[in-house]
Design a protein with these regions (language model features):
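A short, glycine/small-residue-rich beta-strand->loop->alpha-helix junction that serves as a flexible
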Residues: 12-22, 170-185
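Nucleotide-sugar donor-binding patch of glycosyltransferase catalytic domains
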Residues: 267-336
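Active-site regions of enzymes building and remodeling cell-envelope glycoconjugates
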Residues: 50-71, 77-80, 220-240, 275-277, ...
């Protein structure tokens, strides 16, 4: 194909949920409408190309030495204390380097740079229908088959399997909140999951993501009493340091009965492949999972349960694991 030129989007260095929910759909629309005759390139985090496959030709990941400098993603950029959200200079330099490589091949290059302040003051994130093209993702069939086989061989007992993303983030957001105002007490997670495993007679596949720094991640529970008492019923898959991390997460979500997500914006990920999911949210955040664009992706939130009874901070941190289990049990038993 003869391209008019090359359009490079990025460098994206903000939060995963903002990328998934607003940045990605926004540039999909721009690419398909304004740059449809261009070769499209995206610069961003390693492992996330799955959400760009339908409209980006070349996905360029940050090399490790650059990604290691990114420790505080916030909204659309990296947060600097007393400054706000920014795109660090080393990322801009990397973008120019990538652009130069295309120019050296004779291409005319256009840059569409991420705006770290694009979401300040709630812009876009509170819109029922934000600017963008929202699509359901296709799950990689080979990865689906691999993950499904891996899970079935690990358990080999015929029980339903549930994917788990037990969200945790290490930020100083209150002395009684475990480091972040959206965290849930780790002891409560253990009580809740023990009930999910033993009272509902299920297996759990834990999505393990690094919890280092402020970027957030997911607990693995390895070494806990929960894990020691239920080793044969808990499988952990580490999704760090993997070029296909997001593809593999999507495959896992598709290969399991349903998923459980802690209070995180990434709880919308199952929406993009229409798989059943239950998420613990807060009063201040839960309503953001019920906008029109989310209802459209999920056939009006079919097989989606958002439990958002408690307020952020100590309220949700100290909330009852028994109550959450009762809510999940009702949801789980409603699935056909």
């Amino acid at each position: 194909m003869n391209y008019k030129g090359v359009i490079i989007f990025g460098p994206w260095c903000g939060e995963f949920s903002y990328e998934l929910s607003w940045w990605n759909p926004g540039i999909r629309k721009l690419r398909n409408e304004d740059f449809k005759d261009y070769r499209a390139v995206h610069i961003g985090y390693k492992g996330r190309r799955a959400m760009y496959k339908d409209f980006i030709d070349d996905y360029v990941s940050y090399p490790k030495e650059i990604e290691d400098t990114l420790s505080y993603p916030a909204a659309g950029g990296q947060h600097i204390i007393d400054v706000g959200e920014v795109i660090p200079e080393n990322l801009k330099e990397f973008m120019y380097k990538v652009a130069g490589e295309y120019q050296d091949k004779g291409h005319e290059v256009t840059l569409y740079q991420a705006d770290p302040n694009a979401y300040n003051g709630g812009k876009h994130i509170y819109d029922e229908e934000p600017f963008g093209d929202y699509v359901n993702y296709e799950v990689n069939s080979e990865m689906y088959d691999e993950i499904k086989k891996e899970v079935e061989e690990y358990f080999s007992d015929g029980r339903d399997t549930i994917a788990l993303m037990a969200r945790i983030r290490d930020r100083n957001r209150g002395e009684n909140t475990g480091g972040c105002y959206l965290n849930w007490n780790p002891d409560s997670w253990e009580v809740f999951l023990d009930k999910v495993i033993n009272e509902l007679d299920t297996n759990i596949v834990v999505i393990n993501l690094s919890t280092s720094g402020a970027a957030g991640g997911a607990m693995s529970f390895e070494g806990t009493e929960l894990y020691e008492n239920n080793k044969e019923r808990i499988m952990t898959i580490n999704f760090d340091d993997d070029e296909d991390s997001l593809d593999r997460q999507l495959a896992l979500l598709k290969a399991t009965k349903c998923s459980i997500y802690g209070a995180s914006g990434s709880a919308v990920l199952p929406f993009f492949i229409k798989t059943p999911t239950f998420t613990q949210q807060t009063v201040e955040e839960g309503f953001r999972l019920r906008y029109k664009w989310e209802r459209d992706l999920t056939d009006d939130l079919k097989n989606i349960k958002i439990f958002d009874k408690y307020r952020s901070g100590e309220d949700v941190y100290n909330s009852s694991p028994d109550e959450l289990f009762d809510e999940f049990k009702e949801f789980y038993r409603s699935l056909v």
